[in-house]
Each structure stands twice: as structure tokens, then as C-alpha cells.
């Protein structure tokens, strides 16, 4: 039973590597936007209402 578990884990890992590489180009824009939001939060932008509405997707 443990051998079957290991085979499933290894197969899943091997299959996920090529799909991760193929999706890097498509996810580049999403990753950039996410990192921009994190930067705004760390700078305190999302705690001020005008900035939060524009960049953080929240309304007060």
C-alpha cells in the first residue's frame, strides 16, 4: 500500500513540472499584479480609503 502511495506522489510530481513551466508565461501578469498589491499593503495604502478603493478592491 505504501508503494502505491509513493508511485502516485511521484507521478503527480513528474506531471506537474511540465505544466508549471508551460503556465509561467500566462501567470506572469497575475504574479506581477499580486506582488504590486502586496507592496501597497505593506506601505499602508490599503488602510486609507481612497487608495483602498483604487488599488485594493475594497470600498469603505
From Swiss-Prot:
It comes from the Eukaryota. Disulfide bonds join 45-51, 46-56. Pfam families: Toxin_8 (PF07365). InterPro entries: Conotoxin_a-typ, Conotoxin_a-typ_CS. Residues 1-16 form the signal peptide. GO terms for cellular component: extracellular region; host cell postsynaptic membrane. Changing residue 54 to A: 50-fold decrease in inhibition of alpha-6/alpha-3-beta-2-beta-3 (CHRNA6/CHRNA3-CHRNB2-CHRNB3) nAChR. 6-fold decrease in inhibition of alpha-6/alpha-3-beta-4 (CHRNA6/CHRNA3-CHRNB4) nAChR. It is found in: Secreted. The native globular disulfide connectivity of this toxin displays multiple conformations in solution. In contrast, the non-native ribbon isomer has a well-defined conformation. This ribbon isomer is inactive on alpha-3-beta-2 (CHRNA3-CHRNB2) and alpha-3-beta-4 (CHRNA3-CHRNB4)nAChR. Post-translational modification of Pro-49 into hydroxyproline [P49O] induces a 2800-fold decrease in inhibition of alpha-6/alpha-3-beta-2-beta-3 (CHRNA6/CHRNA3-CHRNB2-CHRNB3) and 6-fold decrease in inhibition of alpha-6/alpha-3-beta-4 (CHRNA6/CHRNA3-CHRNB4). Its main location: secreted. One of its GO terms (molecular function) is toxin activity. The record marks 49 as: Critical residue for distinguishing between alpha-6-beta-2/CHRNA6-CHRNB2 and alpha-6-beta-4/CHRNA6-CHRNB4 nAChR subunits. Residues 17-43 form a propeptide. Alpha-conotoxins bind to the nicotinic acetylcholine receptors (nAChR) and inhibit them. This peptide potently blocks numerous mammalian nAChR subtypes: alpha-6/alpha-3-beta-2 (CHRNA6/CHRNA3-CHRNB2) (IC(50)=0.258 nM) > alpha-6/alpha-3-beta-4 (CHRNA6/CHRNA3-CHRNB4) (IC(50)=1.54 nM) > alpha-3-beta-2 (CHRNA3-CHRNB2) (IC(50)=5.72 nM) > alpha-3-beta-4 (CHRNA3-CHRNB4)(IC(50)=27.7 nM) > alpha-4-beta-4 (CHRNA4-CHRNB4) (IC(50)=69.9 nM) > alpha-2-beta-4 (CHRNA2-CHRNB4) (IC(50)=121 nM) > alpha-7 (CHRNA7) (IC(50)=272 nM) > alpha-2-beta-2 (CHRNA2-CHRNB2) (IC(50)=800 nM). Belongs to the conotoxin A superfamily. Negative results: does not inhibit alpha-4-beta-2 (CHRNA4-CHRNB2) nAChR (IC(50)=10.400 uM or >20 uM). The cysteine framework is I (CC-C-C). Alpha4/4 pattern. This is Alpha-conotoxin BuIA. It comes from Conus bullatus (Bubble cone). The lineage of its organism: Eukaryota, Metazoa, Spiralia, Lophotrochozoa, Mollusca.
